């Protein structure tokens, strides 16, 4: 926020206000300002919105709510994910079994979250598909595993469903909840075998994922020190490739290996929806999952 035709003028827990630049050098938006009020109690009962992950946005005033209808929708590139740390407690095939259970048991389709809020992931990014394995019958899960996870709130349902599902496989899942939107130094990640969170994706998906591997405090707890150092060396080599397509293909290979090694799997993406009362025009959702207001316009107020 702060680039393009709008600049950020106010940012609080309840309000984000954008105003158009007076001297923007390209096409000017039709609206002078856009205010985004974060008011989950206003919509939560009827629309099922999550105050931690606002996937439903309604344009208008509270008195307009009975009149609103959907004007734009899409599926996020961002995703909630599961990472797995292999060790003497969790082998490669045991980790693959956990992932197979998640994606093939119907677990993701039966989560107790809002209707049409999420869709089960089949790829990390479009074309970066999740691998599938034939897990040998003799592979049994450990007696206990520990899961750490943070917000959004939809992961509460995921954690409980996973605990129930793994219990049917003879595995007790101990759960640690980190009440924040990101990992930090206070998270007991060193105790966890499994870790869940979410990864927002911006206008440059490949760059976002590359920086995620480099910078998120999660990864030093997923890999051994030597493996993580080797990963950084691989990312350095990828970054030096002069051709963009080659860089993207090389980064895809890195993440494909992480998924095949049962280190990472996406869980689900979000359905984003914009609703508005009659007369609100031109608001759309971009292919990247961003809300576009530059062509939005309102009719002249009635006298």
Please provide the spans of the model-predicted regions.
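Short, solvent-exposed loop/beta-turn-alpha elements that line the ligand-binding surface or hinge
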Residues: 1-3, 67-72, 83-90, 129-137, ...
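Append "and occasionally in soluble cytosolic enzymes with long acidic Gly/Pro-rich linkers
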Residues: 91-168
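Periplasmic binding protein-like
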Residues: 169-217
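Extended ligand-binding regions for polar small-molecule ligands
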Residues: 86-109, 228-248
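Short helix-initiation/N-cap motifs at beta->coil->alpha
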Residues: 35-47, 175-185
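Gly/Pro-rich hinge or "lid" segments in bacterial periplasmic/extracellular proteins
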Residues: 1-38, 43
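A bilobed periplasmic-binding-protein/Venus flytrap-type ligand-binding module shared by bacterial periplasmic
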Residues: 19-22, 70-97, 101, 110
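Bilobed periplasmic-binding protein-like "clamshell/Venus-flytrap" ligand-binding domains
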Residues: 138-149, 241-278
